[in-house]
Amino acid sequence: TYTLGRGTDGRIGLAYKNNDGTQPGDYGDVWFMESVNNGTTFGVPVKIYDADFGPSGDSLGCIRGISMTYKGNAPAVAFETVKQTQEGSFFPGLPARIRFWSNTLPGADPNRSVVVADTSNVGYHPYIGVNDVLSSLGRPNIGVSSNGNALFIAFMVPSDEVGGAADTTTFSDIWLAGSIDGGFTWPQLGKLNPATPIKDWRYVSVSKWNDN
């Protein structure tokens, strides 16, 4: 899984989930690399998230959800981290997180990213039903305001409603998080869709740029 973005000066960023087949030692990790010559060549990949599968680790790693844009010439990456094993299993009913990374955040990689959303601010809603490779939080999509002052991340959160006779599955809600300090904090957070009528809100997308 990968995502592309373009900076103000034309630089191209590529953020991607680790290829667990060819690099099993970096299972569930997230990488970023950048090109300043229109994609002809890219710099050395930088690990921006290091999944911890050790005895005391949380075993949260990226599965599919990753999105990026640029805030000026600063990359801005949103990604999901889901409870999983290095043998290929994941747990849609367990707590997950939405994270944000930029090279303008304090600290050093791969420990620079911050948590945007988890069970502490959106509640715990396990995903049940058909295997859509979804979890209790997932599929983030990121955008930036036209003046470059604000970042927005929209993502999916399972609701407390289920439906379907043959394969009962959780309905999903769409949540939106906002930041005005370059992604260091995300104090603006709320559900976008109405409570009624009950519908399955999925796969949200945020415009990378917005002139209004």
Give the positions of each predicted feature.
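Extracellular, repeat-based ectodomains that mediate carbohydrate processing or recognition
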Residues: 1-212
